[in-house]
Amino acid sequence: MGIRIGIDIGSSTTKIVAFEQEKMLAPMVVRADSQVASLYGAFGRYLYENNLELSDVDGVYITGVGSKYVDKPVYGRPTYKVDEFEATGTGGYYLTDKKEVIVVSMGTGSFFVKVTETEMKHLGGVGLG
């Protein structure tokens, strides 16, 4: 089916979203005491609530402080770690129709990323979770 799953494993919440080609499916936020439990629970729940099968998933893209605990493919699917600044910048840019944006992440760590059609630049701050 060509589904790509993006998961941000933060210090207090796990955010998950899927894309089918360029179409974004409904995002979800999950809380759990364990970041690994939150990752696997969020992924399973997301598949269930969106009527998706594991075989539909072409790739899992993870970021956030909790991604350091993941050292093997998630549920056997191809899994890739994405830099938090890149993930936030790309996501923020996707959500707007502007040609140049400054994306601000306001979580446990706060940072600024400038994104244009051809460039992404971390302006300052830290990504802590």
Regions found by a protein language model. Give the residues of each.
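Short glycine-aspartate micro-motif
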Residues: 2-8, 59-61, 100-105, 123
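Short glycine-rich, Thr/Ser-proximal phosphate-binding strand/loop in the N-terminal lobe
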Residues: 3-41, 45
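A short acidic Gly-Thr/Ser loop motif
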Residues: 8-12, 65, 105-109, 126-129
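Short beta-strand scaffold segments in enzyme catalytic cores
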Residues: 14-19, 109-115
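Short beta-strand-loop/turn "lid" adjacent to the catalytic site in phosphate-handling enzymes
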Residues: 29-32, 43, 48-84, 115-120
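Glycine/small-residue-rich loop that forms an oxyanion/phosphate-binding "nest" at active or ligand-binding sites
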Residues: 71-105, 112-113
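Glycine-rich phosphate-binding loop plus the immediately following alpha-helix
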Residues: 93, 117-129
